[in-house]
């Protein structure tokens, strides 16, 4: 059963232009939630593989027109700051200018494979799942 779920998920990602096989496996569930339950298309993500690296997600350009939704999520996350410790930022760069929103999970762990890091990521996933269920 789990193999079928992963196969279906992989096919869904690839059908939508998300390179499933290139993603950090730890990030797949969060990327699924952001893209398919909330509708915020992602471009890049990283689980953080070195000590104290943050978990990060960068969104596609099209998310710029959903700025109100990003700001709503940022406000909701701010109400749970102590637990979530996440932030959204808009990155401007290059000439001509390019803009992308990014999501940063700010809790840092000395050991990149710390079980607490996985619990932290799961709590963030639950926050986004809860948001998606209300929409």
UniProtKB/Swiss-Prot annotation:
Source organism phylogeny: Bacteria, Bacillati, Bacillota, Bacilli, Bacillales
Domain of life, source organism: Bacteria
Name of the protein in question: SPbeta prophage-derived uncharacterized protein YoqC
């Amino acid at each position: 059963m789990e193999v079928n779920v992963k196969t279906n998920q992989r096919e869904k990602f690839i059908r939508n232009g998300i390179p499933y096989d290139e993603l950090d496996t730890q990030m797949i569930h969060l990327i699924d939630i952001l893209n398919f339950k909330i509708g915020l298309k992602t471009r890049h993500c990283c689980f953080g593989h070195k000590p104290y690296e943050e978990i990060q997600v960068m969104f596609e350009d099209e998310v710029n027109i959903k700025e109100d939704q990003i700001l709503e999520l940022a406000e909701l996350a701010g109400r749970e700051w102590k637990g979530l410790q996440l932030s959204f930022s808009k990155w401007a760069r290059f000439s001509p200018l390019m803009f992308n929103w990014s999501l940063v999970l700010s809790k840092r762990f000395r050991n990149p494979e710390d079980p607490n890091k996985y619990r932290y990521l799961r709590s963030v996933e639950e926050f986004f799942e809860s948001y998606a269920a209300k929409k």
